[in-house]
From Swiss-Prot:
Residue ranges of domain TRAM in the record: 396-457
Protein name: tRNA-2-methylthio-N(6)-dimethylallyladenosine synthase
Organism classification: Bacteria, Pseudomonadati, Pseudomonadota, Alphaproteobacteria, Hyphomicrobiales
Subcellular location: Cytoplasm
Family named by the database record: Belongs to the methylthiotransferase family. MiaB subfamily.
Cofactor, free-text remark: Binds 2 [4Fe-4S] clusters. One cluster is coordinated with 3 cysteines and an exchangeable S-adenosyl-L-methionine.
Top-level taxon of origin: Bacteria
Subunit field text: Monomer.
CDD domains in the cross-refs: Radical_SAM
Entry-linked Pfam families: Radical_SAM, UPF0004
Catalytic activity: N(6)-dimethylallyladenosine(37) in tRNA + (sulfur carrier)-SH + AH2 + 2 S-adenosyl-L-methionine = 2-methylsulfanyl-N(6)-dimethylallyladenosine(37) in tRNA + (sulfur carrier)-H + 5'-deoxyadenosine + L-methionine + A + S-adenosyl-L-homocysteine + 2 H(+)
Amino acid sequence: MNKANPKNTPSVVPKKVFIKTYGCQMNVYDSQRMTDSLSSKGYVATQTPNDADLILLNTCHIREKAAEKLYSDLGRLRVMRQARTLDKPLMIGVTGCVAQAEGNEILRRAPMVDLVIGPQMYHRLPDLLEQTKQGKKIVETDYPVEDKFAHLPPHNKRAVRKRGVSAFLTVQEGCDKFCTFCVVPYTRGAEISRSVEQITEEARQLIEAGVKEITLLGQNVNGWHGQIANGKTWRLGDLLYHLAKLDGLKRLRYTTSHPRDMDDSLIAAHRDLDILMPYLHLPVQSGSDRILKAMNRQHKSIHYLHLIEKIRTARPDIAFSGDFIVGFPGETDEDFEETVKLIKQVQYSSAYSFKYSPRPGTVGATMKNHVDEAVKDARLQHLQVLLLEQQNAFLRSKIGQTTDVLIEKVGRHSGQMVGRSPWLLPVVVDTEASTGTVMSIHIKNAGSNSFVGEIANV
């Protein structure tokens, strides 16, 4: 009996997927999970679109002209697709929040797109791709009955290791706050919280793959809640205490928070858990109570400042970042000065600031009394100068201090590594230490958005 010669067996060439990710950390997580899902169909990730058999654009709808940016990118992909030969066809898909908002309009304006799926549907991606192979165009933007997270495969350990020692983990999705400037409730849907069991299992998978730092994600992450076996309801603070006990995990973070859901148990976690990093992104958007009301933020500036004080009392070394919108409809010079006043009171380590732009479908888009663009520009410049001054002051304040740094990747130069400080900023240090190591580092200097350090003498 002749045995088959494995050398004569033709090898199966894996299909390649390229995912371009726009926007927030949750989109990064979603792209990673889509890659994991597609691995069951023989796809491997590629960093080069020209090599790809499948290109997915995982879109964000938060900023102005998000849809036009998508159509511009699709125009370039159309040219790429036309240049392909018959033996190297290219499939194109649009996912994420612009897909949710635009739906069939994407196929109308870009007929070469094969599938359009919203952020709640990507667990069905492998099956939907099979349908496109039969020439069917797919648009799936409904909210499914099933729990998408329950239908995702386990993390691919090899892929996790390649991504590094820090990882995102979505625990909450959607938003019920309906801020008048924001599209998230319309593109991500109502707030849902994943179960403690699901979150714990996924965290364990990440840790087993070598992850040392996990950032919990949610559009309103501190709105997370879940029931445990005895029927008791947990909030995010309880979840953090629970995850802090997992063997092998060295650091925890979470983002993005709403001031309304920043409760005492969560503040206590900042006080009690060394594993919870002293950094908090807590957007406020405006310092004017009148504008906060128009934005439907459901709190006043004094409430926000009181929270900042309570959190700093619990964790004195904490650094705050925030979000600010200038030029919201009806914003006066006095309103803007209230924002400047709040920023000076808080003293941020970093912050994001933007000009208001109306998002289709939001209440803000129907408001009158819009602020002149030149006024918006001037206010934004004023704000960014102030915020940059605060960022530089924060960076300088850490020079001479010694802090723990998580080594994440190889640096640009030989013998150099880059790590992550407790305040999220990168630290460059000369060391041969392995990734995943937490080292005591003396901060020698600071750049515009990073530190330079050396191994501390212990």
